[in-house]
């Protein structure tokens, strides 16, 4: 009986020993799987981080506003008159030549500014695109409506016409209806006095009279404030400037042949004359070089 009991004890101990070894093996196997899973997860995370790092390295930052200019720089304010061919008359530019110039501006990324925008640029330092120009027309010829206006509309350009108010509806000048249509469609109408007087030759009282009367005539016709003027012949002196300011104008242009900048004075801004004799190369020079006359 004792032998039987001893034999049973030996068998039981043997079975217990085998069970422990299998359990240990199972735990070790699970540990390896777990470790392998952690390593794979870690590698995947590392790869993701690396991938993210590469992505962040390739993100392009927004460019600086290098394509803007401020009022420490100048701007070409272009001066036209009639858009119509006339032999040996530099004040009149042929339609084909005008369109060639406007197409060049459009194709080369130029922005046209209103006089409101020019004022904000010079007086309030509001930035504008580097390649900006201002288009102005003196006197108020009918061909500004018949020839220039369709081209300006085609390219989406802004412009300003300085109108001699006594000429409205006469001869080769713009009619009241044409002025209203132009004003409503991005072509600003401003003053060029009543009779195109040489302001520096008038008494102070006469200066005030023509400056105020032309302003009032246009304001009544167009139902808007008239704030800008072009001096006839470009003539002015200190008395003209004082009368212009006293009459309520905020900005005035002359015929001096350089770019406008804040050093000119807001009531004596320069302009760039575009002659009917100028070829495209000369036009390019004038809109790209502030001191093109030197």
Residue ranges, per PLM feature:
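Short, glycine/acidic-enriched loop or turn micro-motifs at the edges of active sites
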Residues: 141-142, 195
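C-terminal active-site subregion of NodB/CE4 polysaccharide deacetylases
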Residues: 32, 40, 47-136, 142-143, ...
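Short beta-strand and adjacent tight-turn residues that come in two discontinuous sequence segments
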Residues: 162, 192, 252-254
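Histidine-centered catalytic micro-motifs
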Residues: 78-79, 188-196, 232
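Acidic (Asp/Glu)-rich catalytic clusters
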Residues: 149-157, 174-191, 246
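Sec-dependent N-terminal signal peptides of Gram-positive bacterial secreted proteins and lipoproteins
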Residues: 1-24
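Signal peptide processing junction and immediate N-terminal pro/mature segment
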Residues: 18-44
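Active-site glycine- and acidic-residue-rich loops that bind
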Residues: 168-172
